[in-house]
UniProtKB/Swiss-Prot annotation:
Residues in Sequence repeats: 45-55, 56-66
Region feature (2 X 12 AA approximate tandem repeats): 45-66
Compartments, as annotated in UniProt: Cytoplasm
Protein family per UniProt: Belongs to the GLTP family.
Identification of the protein by name: Glycolipid transfer protein
Length: 209
Protein backbone atom coordinates (compact mmCIF):
# COMPACT_ATOMS: atom_id res chain seq x y z
CA UNK A 1 0.00 0.00 0.00
CA UNK A 2 3.07 2.19 0.26
CA UNK A 3 2.71 2.98 -3.43
CA UNK A 4 -0.48 4.97 -2.75
CA UNK A 5 -0.10 6.04 0.87
CA UNK A 6 3.11 7.98 0.27
CA UNK A 7 1.45 10.37 -2.18
CA UNK A 8 -2.01 11.31 -0.94
CA UNK A 9 -3.85 14.02 -2.85
CA UNK A 10 -4.66 17.26 -1.05
CA UNK A 11 -8.18 17.74 0.37
CA UNK A 12 -10.49 19.46 -2.11
CA UNK A 13 -11.05 23.14 -1.15
CA UNK A 14 -14.53 24.61 -0.75
CA UNK A 15 -14.43 26.18 -4.22
CA UNK A 16 -13.47 22.76 -5.70
CA UNK A 17 -10.54 24.34 -7.57
CA UNK A 18 -7.67 21.90 -8.01
CA UNK A 19 -4.16 23.37 -7.92
CA UNK A 20 -2.25 22.11 -10.93
CA UNK A 21 1.22 21.76 -9.38
CA UNK A 22 0.33 19.62 -6.34
CA UNK A 23 -2.11 17.58 -8.44
CA UNK A 24 0.52 16.71 -11.05
CA UNK A 25 3.08 15.92 -8.37
CA UNK A 26 0.71 13.48 -6.66
CA UNK A 27 -0.57 11.66 -9.75
CA UNK A 28 2.94 11.38 -11.24
CA UNK A 29 3.53 8.54 -8.77
CA UNK A 30 0.50 6.52 -9.94
CA UNK A 31 1.67 4.89 -13.22
CA UNK A 32 3.59 2.11 -11.35
CA UNK A 33 0.18 1.05 -10.01
CA UNK A 34 -0.32 -0.80 -13.30
CA UNK A 35 2.84 -2.83 -12.74
CA UNK A 36 1.02 -4.35 -9.76
CA UNK A 37 -1.61 -5.73 -12.15
CA UNK A 38 1.04 -7.99 -13.63
CA UNK A 39 -0.14 -8.22 -17.23
CA UNK A 40 1.83 -6.19 -19.80
CA UNK A 41 -1.49 -5.56 -21.57
CA UNK A 42 -2.16 -2.82 -19.00
CA UNK A 43 1.00 -1.05 -20.16
CA UNK A 44 -0.91 1.16 -22.66
CA UNK A 45 -3.01 2.67 -19.83
CA UNK A 46 0.16 3.26 -17.82
CA UNK A 47 1.87 4.90 -20.81
CA UNK A 48 -1.23 6.98 -21.55
CA UNK A 49 -1.37 8.32 -17.99
CA UNK A 50 2.36 9.12 -17.97
CA UNK A 51 2.18 10.79 -21.38
CA UNK A 52 -0.80 12.94 -20.46
CA UNK A 53 0.80 14.04 -17.18
CA UNK A 54 3.87 15.11 -19.20
CA UNK A 55 1.72 17.09 -21.66
CA UNK A 56 -0.16 18.92 -18.90
CA UNK A 57 3.06 19.67 -17.01
CA UNK A 58 4.64 21.10 -20.17
CA UNK A 59 1.80 23.61 -20.44
CA UNK A 60 1.79 24.36 -16.71
CA UNK A 61 5.55 25.00 -16.67
CA UNK A 62 5.24 27.74 -19.30
CA UNK A 63 3.37 29.93 -16.80
CA UNK A 64 2.58 28.39 -13.38
CA UNK A 65 0.74 31.53 -12.26
CA UNK A 66 -1.56 31.62 -15.29
CA UNK A 67 -2.21 27.88 -15.05
CA UNK A 68 -2.43 27.71 -11.26
CA UNK A 69 -5.56 25.54 -11.32
CA UNK A 70 -6.81 22.90 -13.73
CA UNK A 71 -9.79 25.12 -14.51
CA UNK A 72 -7.38 27.92 -15.44
CA UNK A 73 -5.87 25.59 -18.05
CA UNK A 74 -9.24 24.84 -19.63
CA UNK A 75 -10.32 28.49 -19.59
CA UNK A 76 -7.07 29.80 -21.10
CA UNK A 77 -6.93 27.10 -23.77
CA UNK A 78 -10.58 27.66 -24.68
CA UNK A 79 -9.74 31.27 -25.51
CA UNK A 80 -6.46 30.32 -27.15
CA UNK A 81 -7.62 27.53 -29.48
CA UNK A 82 -11.13 28.65 -30.36
CA UNK A 83 -13.04 26.09 -32.46
CA UNK A 84 -10.30 23.44 -32.03
CA UNK A 85 -10.95 23.32 -28.28
CA UNK A 86 -11.44 21.02 -26.36
CA UNK A 87 -9.82 18.43 -28.64
CA UNK A 88 -6.39 19.99 -28.23
CA UNK A 89 -3.58 20.82 -25.80
CA UNK A 90 -3.58 20.13 -22.08
CA UNK A 91 -7.39 20.10 -22.13
CA UNK A 92 -7.34 16.93 -24.22
CA UNK A 93 -4.52 15.44 -22.15
CA UNK A 94 -6.48 15.99 -18.92
CA UNK A 95 -9.60 14.55 -20.56
CA UNK A 96 -7.84 11.22 -21.07
CA UNK A 97 -5.87 11.42 -17.82
CA UNK A 98 -9.05 11.66 -15.76
CA UNK A 99 -10.32 8.48 -17.42
CA UNK A 100 -7.19 6.55 -16.51
CA UNK A 101 -7.39 7.91 -12.97
CA UNK A 102 -11.07 6.93 -12.79
CA UNK A 103 -10.09 3.37 -13.76
CA UNK A 104 -7.78 3.23 -10.73
CA UNK A 105 -10.45 4.72 -8.47
CA UNK A 106 -13.27 2.36 -9.48
CA UNK A 107 -10.96 -0.64 -9.34
CA UNK A 108 -9.69 0.11 -5.83
CA UNK A 109 -13.15 1.05 -4.54
CA UNK A 110 -14.56 -2.21 -5.88
CA UNK A 111 -11.90 -4.19 -4.01
CA UNK A 112 -12.54 -2.24 -0.81
CA UNK A 113 -16.29 -2.84 -1.18
CA UNK A 114 -15.64 -6.58 -1.26
CA UNK A 115 -17.01 -7.14 -4.77
CA UNK A 116 -15.75 -10.49 -6.05
CA UNK A 117 -16.44 -13.67 -7.96
CA UNK A 118 -17.80 -15.97 -5.25
CA UNK A 119 -16.46 -18.99 -7.12
CA UNK A 120 -12.98 -17.45 -7.32
CA UNK A 121 -12.79 -14.96 -4.41
CA UNK A 122 -9.05 -14.35 -4.75
CA UNK A 123 -9.30 -13.16 -8.36
CA UNK A 124 -9.57 -9.43 -9.15
CA UNK A 125 -11.08 -9.94 -12.59
CA UNK A 126 -14.50 -8.69 -11.42
CA UNK A 127 -12.96 -5.51 -10.02
CA UNK A 128 -10.81 -4.78 -13.07
CA UNK A 129 -13.70 -5.46 -15.44
CA UNK A 130 -15.98 -3.06 -13.54
CA UNK A 131 -13.31 -0.36 -13.66
CA UNK A 132 -12.79 -0.85 -17.39
CA UNK A 133 -16.54 -0.83 -18.10
CA UNK A 134 -17.11 2.38 -16.13
CA UNK A 135 -13.99 4.36 -17.03
CA UNK A 136 -12.66 3.38 -20.43
CA UNK A 137 -14.66 0.87 -22.47
CA UNK A 138 -17.03 3.34 -24.20
CA UNK A 139 -14.04 5.29 -25.52
CA UNK A 140 -12.35 2.23 -27.04
CA UNK A 141 -13.06 0.63 -30.41
CA UNK A 142 -13.77 -3.10 -30.66
CA UNK A 143 -10.13 -4.07 -31.19
CA UNK A 144 -8.89 -2.26 -28.09
CA UNK A 145 -11.82 -3.66 -26.11
CA UNK A 146 -10.85 -7.16 -27.21
CA UNK A 147 -7.26 -6.62 -26.07
CA UNK A 148 -8.35 -5.43 -22.65
CA UNK A 149 -10.84 -8.26 -22.25
CA UNK A 150 -7.91 -10.64 -22.70
CA UNK A 151 -5.90 -8.63 -20.17
CA UNK A 152 -8.55 -9.11 -17.52
CA UNK A 153 -7.99 -12.86 -17.63
CA UNK A 154 -4.31 -12.30 -16.93
CA UNK A 155 -4.98 -10.17 -13.83
CA UNK A 156 -3.18 -11.43 -10.70
CA UNK A 157 -4.66 -12.87 -7.53
CA UNK A 158 -5.92 -10.24 -5.09
CA UNK A 159 -3.40 -11.37 -2.47
CA UNK A 160 -0.52 -10.94 -4.93
CA UNK A 161 -1.86 -7.56 -6.10
CA UNK A 162 -2.12 -6.21 -2.54
CA UNK A 163 1.37 -7.49 -1.75
CA UNK A 164 2.75 -5.71 -4.83
CA UNK A 165 0.85 -2.56 -3.87
CA UNK A 166 2.42 -2.74 -0.41
CA UNK A 167 5.88 -3.02 -1.98
CA UNK A 168 6.46 -6.27 -0.12
CA UNK A 169 5.76 -4.81 3.34
CA UNK A 170 4.48 -7.32 5.86
CA UNK A 171 0.93 -6.01 6.38
CA UNK A 172 -2.39 -7.81 6.67
CA UNK A 173 -4.99 -7.60 3.92
CA UNK A 174 -7.28 -5.52 6.15
CA UNK A 175 -4.47 -3.08 6.97
CA UNK A 176 -3.79 -2.70 3.27
CA UNK A 177 -7.47 -2.15 2.47
CA UNK A 178 -7.75 0.45 5.22
CA UNK A 179 -4.89 2.42 3.69
CA UNK A 180 -6.52 2.18 0.27
CA UNK A 181 -9.75 3.58 1.75
CA UNK A 182 -7.77 6.48 3.22
CA UNK A 183 -6.13 7.16 -0.15
CA UNK A 184 -9.49 7.10 -1.93
CA UNK A 185 -11.07 9.88 0.17
CA UNK A 186 -9.29 12.85 -1.44
CA UNK A 187 -8.50 10.96 -4.64
CA UNK A 188 -12.16 10.24 -5.43
CA UNK A 189 -13.25 13.78 -4.56
CA UNK A 190 -10.58 15.19 -6.87
CA UNK A 191 -11.49 12.95 -9.82
CA UNK A 192 -15.19 13.74 -9.33
CA UNK A 193 -14.40 17.47 -9.38
CA UNK A 194 -12.47 17.14 -12.66
CA UNK A 195 -15.38 15.30 -14.27
CA UNK A 196 -17.78 17.99 -13.02
CA UNK A 197 -15.53 20.70 -14.47
CA UNK A 198 -15.52 19.08 -17.90
CA UNK A 199 -19.30 18.78 -17.84
CA UNK A 200 -19.84 22.39 -16.75
CA UNK A 201 -17.44 23.72 -19.39
CA UNK A 202 -18.89 21.47 -22.09
CA UNK A 203 -15.43 20.01 -22.66
CA UNK A 204 -16.32 16.31 -22.54
CA UNK A 205 -15.76 14.29 -25.74
CA UNK A 206 -16.91 10.77 -26.57
CA UNK A 207 -14.89 9.76 -29.64
CA UNK A 208 -13.29 6.30 -29.63
CA UNK A 209 -9.72 5.17 -30.20
Amino acid sequence: MALLAEHLLKPLPADRQIETGPFLEAVAHLPPFFDCLGSPVFTPIKADISGNITKIKAVYDTDPAKFKTLQNILEVEKGMYGAEWPKVGATLALLWLKRGLRFIQVFLQSICDGERDENHPNLIRVNANKAYEMALKKYHGWLVQKIFKAALYAAPYKSDFLKALSKGQNVTEEECLEKIRLFLVNYTATIDAIYEMYTKMNAELDYTV
